[in-house]
Amino acid sequence: MTKLIKQLFASLVLLMTANTCLAGAGGDLTPAVQHDLNPRYISLLEGEALHKQGDVYFFDVNTLEIWAEGFIPGAVFFNVKGWRELLPKNKDAQMVFYCANRLCTASVVAAREVMKLGYTNVLQMPDGIYGWRMSGRPHEVP
């Protein structure tokens, strides 16, 4: 019985040691990327209020397949090569970027790229078009 307890204890110690050794997966740990430019995140409610306001640009950064399922009325499909030409001339114009949902990062990437060009009033709506449609808000299909 004591032999079994010793073997179990030794196995437990080896497992705990292995977990500690393998925690870094054999590579050096690197710090997470810190971005200097981050858009302000808005809720669906804020997005809806801005949409009703009317003088706000909405940019859909989804794939063509997701865009074809539906988009926010008046939103511009942004996932194109000539996206810079779609931007307003006024660098202070209010713009909302969205993609599919909170798991999609395309709208954050697009918003940061726009901010690099000097645009100052850039917003991102993390809930995206899926959140918009699931909450019963109006949408259009092409």
Description of each model-found segment:
Residues 83-132:
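Catalytic cysteine-centered active loop of the rhodanese-like fold, especially the PTP/DSP P-loop
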Residues 76-79:
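Short acidic-hydrophobic, aromatic-tinged amphipathic segments that line or gate anion-handling sites
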Residues 2-57, 64-66, 142:
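Flexible, polar/low-complexity N-terminal or interdomain linker segments that lie immediately upstream
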Residues 52-58, 73-74, 120-121:
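Short active-site oxyanion
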Residues 133-141:
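Short, low-complexity, Pro/Ser/Thr/Gly-rich segments in the mature regions of secreted, periplasmic
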Residues 64, 100-102, 137:
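Solvent-exposed coil/turn segments that connect beta secondary-structure elements
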Residues 67-71:
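Mid-length scaffold segments of soluble, non-membrane domains
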Residues 63, 82:
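Short, glycine/acidic-enriched loop or turn micro-motifs at the edges of active sites
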